[in-house]
Amino acid sequence: IELNGKDISDEDFAMTITAVKVAADSIVQKGVCEQPTQFEILTAAAFLYFHLQKVDYAVIEVGLGGLWDSTNIITPVVSVITNVSLDHTDRCGATVARIAMQKAGIIKEKVPVVTAAEGEEALGPIVTMAMFKEAPVYLYGKAFYGTEVTSSMDGQKFTLHAGDYYHSDY
C-alpha cells in the first residue's frame, strides 16, 4: 500500500489490517461469509487507508483476473487492461480469450476502458463487454501511445501522445 509514492507506515499498516481483521472475524463468526483470503484483507485495508487519508484518486491493481477479484467492488473513473497473456491459467482459463473475458470483468457501465491488449482473441471479449456496458474503449497504438524517454531501477519516464493531447515526463 502506497500513498504518493511512499509505503504506508508500519503503524498505519498495523492499524488498518487490525481493523479489517476484527471486522472480518466478526462477520465470519456471524456466518455472513467465509474467512476472507489474505489478498481480500489487504485490499480492504488499502481501501480503508485511502479513505482515512481522503485521497482524491487511487490506482487499484487487480490481484488475479478481474471478474471475481476483490478489487472489483469499486466503480473506477477509468478501467485499464494492460495486456492479456497466458498467466494464471489454472484460475482464469487456458486460452487468451478466456483470460480476456476474466479481465473484462472489471469493465463497468459507461466507464472508459484503456487497453494495450492485442489481437482478436484478446480484444474481442474486451470490446464486446465494453459495448455491452456502453463503455468507450481507447486502444494503445490507436487512441494513444507512449514514447520511452528513460528507464532505470527508479522508474520510467515517457512522453504520452493522445490525439491532440501531448505531455512529457511521466
State the predicted function of each range.
Residues 1-74, 90-92, 120:
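ATP-dependent carboxylate-amine ligase catalytic core
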